[in-house]
């Protein structure tokens, strides 16, 4: 019998940080979901995300938080910020475009000036956060660690 498979303390010590990371990754989505139900239900992008896309991100980031907790936390909070920024920016852009719209713009509203640009803004912001984190993790963080080691010696 392998001792590490039956060691209760070892299991508990490994399980607790993983649960904390999963809860921390879910926290911004729970807050956004509740805020959407209470205040933002009339806004297009919040309502669209509430209809099922929050759930997909929750599941993915919970699974990711087991192996890559820092990446999952950065992705979760970056995604929440991107959703909020994209929604308000998309609504403001659409209202501005309504003021300058011509009758032809109303005919082709799904692809023209009157389309809601929140999904594209969200995708760009989300991938910007991911790329910046990957660049930080691969380039900047090792340099910081090396500098700390040199100063400590």
Predicted features by range, described:
Residues 9-13, 17, 42, 46, ...:
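Juxtamembrane/transmembrane-helix boundary motifs in multi-pass membrane proteins
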Residues 26-36, 78-92:
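Aromatic-anchored segments of alpha-helical transmembrane domains
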Residues 53-77:
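Canonical alpha-helical transmembrane segments
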Residues 70-84, 96-99:
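Membrane-helix interface/capping segments
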